[in-house]
Amino acid sequence: MHHHLNTLYQGQSLSRESTRDAFGQVVRGEVDPIVLASLLTALKIKGETPEEIAGAAEALLAEARDFPRPDYEFCDIVGTGGDGLNTINVSTTSALVAAACGLKVAKHGNRSVSSKSGSSDLLDKMGIKLDMSPAQARRCLDELGICFLFAPQYHAGVRHAMPVRQALKTRTLFNVLGPLINPARPTYQLMGVYAPELVRPIAETLLALGLKTGMVVHGAGLDEIAIHGPTQVAQIRDGEIREFLLTPADFGLETYPVSAIQGGEPEENRAITAAILEGRGTPAHNAAIAANVAPLLLMAGKAKDLKSAAAEVLAVLASGKTAELAARLATLSHQEASHQEA
């Protein structure tokens, strides 16, 4: 580890292999907290490269609990959190809606980082069991087209870094790792980042990790596609990255103020999500979901352009069938537990 630190102290970047080695030691609990603080701080001050981020992600994936990966195409929609704007749970709600649109979604999530209610906080309130086994999660993915993978269940080793992260009180490499370490390893992905300068490096990281199709976005202050302004996009396709801007008009949607998608406490966010899923969402809420699900439909080849994709999402929202899917997921997520108790 000290060899890696000396490289960083000289202002040089680590190789992917070196970073993989360093973070493998971290998640196995082999690194002294003071040394770990030095590692994270040195990386932060130098600026983490895509190779370093990819190496760290590979280390965490190598140490993760196994998930029985399916051989069909499936996706994830996830944000880094940390944008500080406390909006409604767009990515979690979008994951459910994407499944109702016929996609397969394995959503990797955790408790709140930035908003008052992270994806796991919301699922808890909806009665969806967070700590189901990998086999049961796979069953949900097969039968319902959606499963949620609770990060601490798959990445237990990350707990070794938690005291240092909390003591440092600043963003570190760990803040961008969550969306990159889905243990199911989705075949395509929409990932939101908390800062515009991360869009390109994170796209390069996903490409280095072998993602074939994906999109990294930052939406005018949000870690998701914005309905209140332009969204910076880095699109991954056929081994290349293309950068462009998207506006609500590109989806055939109106522009709304960011205040129109403000979230609240977990109970309040659950009520907002329930309304959206039941077809009672506000126009702004529906637009936010449509904008974030539409690219997934396009990546999956289920729509010809973003406007027709967004229109399809709005139709699915209006039908209320996503609420039925969420209820079935809540039931199925608990079946294994009741079976074992019997």
Curated annotation (Swiss-Prot):
Claim: Coiled coil is one of the keywords in the record: no
Sites where the protein binds Mg(2+) 1: 91, 224
Residues binding anthranilate 1: 79, 110
Example of a GO cellular component annotation carried by this entry: cytosol
Annotated coiled-coil segments of the chain: none
Cofactor: Mg(2+)
Keywords: Amino-acid biosynthesis, Aromatic amino acid biosynthesis, Glycosyltransferase, Magnesium, Metal-binding, Transferase, Tryptophan biosynthesis
InterPro entries in the record: Anthranilate_Pribosyl_Tfrase, Glycosyl_Trfase_fam3, Glycosyl_Trfase_fam3_N_dom, Glycosyl_Trfase_fam3_N_dom_sf, Nuc_phospho_transferase
Cofactor-binding details, from the entry: Binds 2 magnesium ions per monomer.
Binding-site list for anthranilate 2: 165
GO terms (BP aspect): L-tryptophan biosynthetic process
Pathway the protein acts in: Amino-acid biosynthesis; L-tryptophan biosynthesis; L-tryptophan from chorismate: step 2/5
Pfam name, any one: Glycos_trans_3N
Gene3D superfamilies reported in the protein's UniProt record: Nucleoside phosphorylase/phosphoribosyltransferase catalytic domain (3.40.1030.10), Transferase, Pyrimidine Nucleoside Phosphorylase, Chain C (1.20.970.10)
Enzyme class, first EC level, given as a word: transferase
EC numbers, comma separated: 2.4.2.18
Protein family: Belongs to the anthranilate phosphoribosyltransferase family.
Quaternary organization: Homodimer.
Function comment: Catalyzes the transfer of the phosphoribosyl group of 5-phosphorylribose-1-pyrophosphate (PRPP) to anthranilate to yield N-(5'-phosphoribosyl)-anthranilate (PRA).
Full protein name: Anthranilate phosphoribosyltransferase
Species of provenance: Aeromonas hydrophila subsp. hydrophila (strain ATCC 7966 / DSM 30187 / BCRC 13018 / CCUG 14551 / JCM 1027 / KCTC 2358 / NCIMB 9240 / NCTC 8049)
UniProt lineage: Bacteria, Pseudomonadati, Pseudomonadota, Gammaproteobacteria, Aeromonadales
